[in-house]
Amino acid sequence: MLSLEGVDLRGKKVLLRPDINSPLDPQSKEIVNDERIVKTIPVIQMLLKGGASVAIIAHQGDTLDYQNLTDLSKHAQKISEYLDHPVEYLDDVCGPAAVQRVKALKPGEIVILGNLRYLTEEVSTFERDVKLDAAAYTKTWEVRNLAPLFDLYVNEAFSAAHRNSPSMVAFQELLPTYAGPLLFQEYEALSKILHGAQKPAVFVLGGAKISDAFGMMKPVLENGTADKILTSGVTGLVMLIAAGINVGEKTVRFLKDKDLLGFVEDSKEYLKNYPDKIMMPVDVAIEENGKRVEIDIDEMPKDTLYLDIGAKTVAAYREV
């Protein structure tokens, strides 16, 4: 992985891929937390200071959950405010308008192209069902149209690094590629964790993106890095099913609709091979009449989804 530090950027056209995917207000669609946008500012400043012109490609929301799927005009406005520098938004990713604008970019100019998730080639179902490798992705419309316009590609999207999509894996096949300072920093920190630099090591894996959790679980169990793995969220649900716990038809249907039941077999293997290292929820919180109610796992109603781990689980995890 090559660092951007010291690279001659004078007069170069740079394709920057950050992760500025942000939570939005459900009604107004205003950005309610711009932390990821703020973290992108240093690499943009570095590129501008070096004399480059910058085109940004990024995503907002996901086709598995359309609530946060919007254009990037408000992201452009935020970046402009933090930089105190003009940032243009163009509602096109790789069509004629985008190509024409990128060709005309001058040093010091910044343009944010349209939401990548509006492209079929970048959506989750395409990534999951088609399963192309990096070389094949170079033949996508997005990469064929954009790659010839740039001198180099900078990846600053560590939080999206698990994605097998053209914007994440294909441009480095065709362009000189560098890691932005944030990606480089986070990569080094993760490398230390994965290689057991600090002991004891406890991993807390939860949330809805269980591909991330299971992607990390396998190596840290196999190489002995993890002393304990505490599961919650959807990851915890899958583990409970693998352990033979009846979590109800509604939960199973939810996991099936999200195409997540495939992780159950992996979970069974991990529980068999590492029974003392993996902890699962012993109680959960559900909603009853608009109120939070905590119940043991074996008492969980079969027609509801759990919202959170319960106090008993929290207490058990604190003891680790």
Regions found by a protein language model. Name each.
Residues 1-320:
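Active-site loop-to-helix "anion-binding N-cap" substructures in soluble metabolic enzymes
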